[in-house]
Amino acid sequence: MEYTEVMVRYGELSTKGKNRKDFINRLATNVERVLKDFPQIEFHPRHDRMHIILNGAPFTEVDKRLKKVFGIQTYSPAIKIPKTLEDIEKTSLELMKETFKPGMTFKINTKRSDHKFEYDTNQLNNLVGDFLFDNIDNLKAEMKHPDLVLRIEVRQDAVYISNQLLHGVGGMPVGTAGKAVMMLSGGIDSPVASWLALKRGVDIEMVHFFSPPYTTEKALAKAKELTGILANYAGKINFIAVPFAEIQETIKEKLPEGYLMTVQRRFMLQLADRIRAMRGGLAIFNGESVGQVASQTLESMVAINDVTTTPVIRPVATMDKTEIIAKAEEIGTFDLSIQPFEDCCTIFAPPRPKTKPKLDKAREYEARLDVEGLIQRALDGIEVMPIYPNQKFLDDKAQEDADLL
């Protein structure tokens, strides 16, 4: 049967008290944005749920997009019918036959906001249930843990019937928790951290460091394409490319090998913080996981974080690598993340970086450099571009070459 509307139930919005209206409006805006390709759709956000009137739009396509909107707890496609027992019984039977398999159990859940309707909820449950038993063989009722739930809502204007309860991704609507920058590499961890930041309602902008000619255009395209995958969950994400080659060359030329990584990361964090301030962000996110590599030990974090008082949030800090990989596969970033295009974090990596760098040493070595000049020249060269869902930047040839490596 062709569904006529979708009933969307909110996630954590119920806990937000007086800010609830703002959160609902933001969610409605985000839903409208992901469904903008269907101009016939109407949106009606209300206190307890949102009604999406399909007006002929295919639910299968709408479903694919709603699954990626943060702030949705559950949703149900429904059919609007006239308020007669005959129509209710007929539609209920058609929906049940679409999903019922022998041995399945069911229950009917009726709600009635129109108390002038001729049948109350118990009467309607019994009448429709008896009709289904008469027309479907081997049908069994189960009140506690049924396989199928037929939901009937009697409203003032019509009756709405649904046979599915679909789960959204939960979380908070993107944009309700403020704005931040995300330090995005081309690896596995930072895209997962980005997804987790979006899930908490943070409006993130990607900061990506690239170092031509040491890194290729393919490496930059890979980072942009990762952003395109994540934009499925946000509608649009700004991508900020930061030239980093001069800083890396200077550090390699003038500082001891053991502190190359530490000082390099200090520069990255300072640049991310400057960009955050320029863009009106409140925090910095990254994909660091405690102890995973030399620059992510607690001692390294102390030596690197020293350059800012801005909150640095690490969503995957306590996750095992296997957990991060599983999430990357789930959200669709893993296959692209493992494509072997070198990023700026690997090209100048020393063979024996300090795992327990000293803060005073890091400060001392950094002070030998023209810190402000290097940072300003990098900022002068940044490029900002909006990236939209599934936007492509790697051509097929680049993908084929990467698969062969």
Swiss-Prot record:
It comes from Lactobacillus acidophilus (strain ATCC 700396 / NCK56 / N2 / NCFM). GO terms for cellular component: cytosol. This is Probable tRNA sulfurtransferase. Keywords: ATP-binding, Cytoplasm, Nucleotide-binding, RNA-binding, Thiamine biosynthesis, Transferase, tRNA-binding. Its EC number is 2.8.1.4. ATP binds at M183, L184, H208, F209, R265, G287, Q296. Its main location: cytoplasm. SUPFAM superfamilies: Adenine nucleotide alpha hydrolases-like (SSF52402), THUMP domain-like (SSF143437).
